[in-house]
């Protein structure tokens, strides 16, 4: 059941299932930029669209503020106008719930204004192209953000979305080193408690930072909704998020650009993590966030919104303002028709306040979404790729979960996400745990109890080999449930399973069955080391060789 908050910003914001964000990361490098912005025209477009709530930019990634800040940079072409305040007031008058947008960490003005607070990555860089970063462990950066938040919260908004609460890279700045208190690990090694401990430090630091911002917002403006960017939940270890970000948010919210398969998994993940329904699923109305003009079809937008609603969430589409400050009316007319078409579905979801009755659960362990493929790489030589949440970041554990859920979707099997903090498994008949190598004792205890009570557990890979701090590694905590013991060795990066010789990539743990365990399939290895340049069976591939007696399926 959805909580009742009375006549508060939280209640007003969370009663909306159709939402809009107009991206506004426009610089002031040309005199014409933002000169044609009109709050009246902006509000006309929002009203035309038919949405119930609109998120308005108070400050963008450039650090340009759209109100008269005393603590940062005002967009130079506004000539002192408070377009944020005018827009928020106009939306309120029009009966549209206003929510503020603010960015942290990715804040060029703060990084330039306070250069000693910048992120310094593992190769010594303090920015990535156009983006300049500050470190969440730098107290002066936090103080700067709180000062701007205090200004923004003076306005009549019902909620605030704090963007970019994730690590843009592996920060090695002085504040991180001082807070960590130990030398940083020089080599990436997911089998080492030292490296895993460093990763947990990154996650805890970020969660603490997010919670401090949330607590500040609640002190300044009690009763409004506050949430953080949580899309990195599907990006793995590198961006450094944990379920602490969800705990610091009133509802799960974030933007995704990975298409249908990613959305189907993301909405169920958000439904599992959100503290207060509905969660908020954002995506661009253009083909991608990097594309300013090419629009998705009406059917694609409709099905995306419907997928979100079907899982109990609120849909939010992202448009992008033109550099001169104008908007394209054609889209808002299309959006109007789309919202009318979606109205009966919105009303049904709002009135029913339903929850998933699925009997199949897919276990999501954020702590386990690591990348063993980079084991052995020196930290100073590691390249983590572009530091943002706009692409689909490859991660073997996440890829396995996405593949598993796509199979369930094609079988028309209802499923839901179970998280590390889910205590109640009632209603579940089957639980699928995909290579969740890092599980806390309380998690393995719940899984063991689930099996004891008659549930079917499907676990893959290195599930339960370590605790969340990386300790263990000698045997599975759930070895008694699996019926196998770890030999201490792993396979090469290609294996084949059973008589069907099902191909798989990754270094899987090699095990031995205990007495009375029924082995239903064994592993087959290639005849030669994978991708050996001189010794191989086939020049293009690594075909199966001799069958082994290592269990693959028990």
Protein language model regions, located:
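Carbohydrate-binding surfaces of carbohydrate-active enzymes
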Residues: 3, 7, 12-16, 45, ...
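N-terminal structural segment of carbohydrate-active enzymes
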Residues: 3-64, 94-96
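Short, solvent-exposed turn/loop segments enriched in Gly/Ser/Thr/Pro and often Arg
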Residues: 23-25, 55-63, 102-109, 161-171, ...
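Active-site mouth loops of central-metabolism enzymes
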Residues: 24-38, 130-144, 289-298
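Aromatic-lined carbohydrate-binding/catalytic grooves of carbohydrate-active enzymes
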Residues: 42-43, 47-83, 106-130, 136, ...
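An active-site-proximal structural segment forming one wall of the substrate-binding cleft
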Residues: 45, 132-167, 216, 341-348
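Structural motif
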Residues: 48-49, 155, 311
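Active-site-adjacent "subsite" loops/lids of carbohydrate-active enzymes
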Residues: 100-155, 172, 184-199, 211, ...
